[in-house]
């Protein structure tokens, strides 16, 4: 079934005729209540975070951007408010210091599949499995809003460690970005895909915040705390490349 509109009466009527026992939602937009309330045992959702942390559209990205050392998946009963339903199962996954969102996404995809199957097994064993309200958890809810041009831009008035996490949390897609100017040339826009932190370098009169510092093979920016070395970047309209290759091309012009 693939309706043009989820509230389409012919679609809803067809679902009623199927008499579904359980609804399952994975990586899909909000369903209208007339759809998710229809299955006899309700509808469950798989979410890419340890709820109530990171409710919203981009939970995997924001967990890494915020420097979390652990994330996971949650299955829960669907209700009106986004990602607030009673929790059925959770599974945890560590985040290593250099993991990016691409790697964690792929690992959570497999973990999520296992957790979803285990959740369905709960309903096979008991048509009313225990589910815990999110308000019972001693954890403050946090949000994972939609990624935009504004919240993916790198700003040099932040510490290098935070910017590094932002790059990891957006790589390879949609990618953090910045605008840099080389030797007074027109500013260029880049996607930034891999970075390293040099935390001992503080702003100074010689290297103020936001200054570009070029080595023979390195490209660094002075931040509010430490320097951020850009190791892999992607100029607009070109393929991703090591910063050293970009610098070689820049100097050969």
Identify the residue ranges that each predicted region occupies.
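One-carbon transfer enzymes
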Residues: 1-172, 186, 235-237, 242, ...
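An anion-binding loop in the catalytic cleft
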Residues: 151, 156-253
């Amino acid at each position: 079934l693939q309706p043009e509109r989820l509230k389409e009466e012919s679609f809803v009527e067809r679902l009623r005729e199927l008499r579904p026992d359980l609804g399952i939602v994975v990586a899909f937009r909000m369903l209208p209540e007339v759809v998710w309330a229809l299955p006899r045992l309700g509808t469950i959702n798989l979410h890419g975070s340890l709820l109530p942390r990171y409710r919203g559209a981009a939970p995997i990205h924001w967990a890494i951007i915020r420097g979390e050392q652990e994330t996971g998946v949650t299955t829960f009963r669907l209700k009106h408010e986004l990602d607030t339903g009673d929790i059925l199962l959770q599974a945890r996954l560590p985040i290593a210091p250099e993991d990016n969102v691409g790697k964690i996404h792929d690992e959570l995809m497999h973990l999520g599949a296992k957790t979803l199957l285990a959740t369905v097994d709960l309903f096979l064993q008991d048509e009313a499995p225990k589910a815990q309200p999110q308000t019972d958890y001693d954890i403050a809810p946090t949000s994972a809003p939609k990624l935009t041009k504004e919240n993916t831009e790198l700003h040099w008035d932040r510490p290098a460690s935070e910017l590094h996490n932002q790059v990891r949390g957006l790589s390879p897609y949609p990618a953090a970005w910045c605008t840099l100017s080389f030797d007074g040339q027109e500013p260029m826009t880049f996607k930034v895909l891999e970075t390293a932190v040099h935390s001992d370098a503080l702003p100074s009169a010689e290297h103020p915040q936001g200054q570009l510092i070029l080595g023979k093979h390195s490209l660094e920016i002075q931040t509010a705390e430490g320097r951020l070395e850009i190791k892999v970047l992607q100029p607009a309209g070109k393929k991703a490349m090591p910063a050293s290759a970009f610098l070689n091309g820049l100097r050969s012009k």
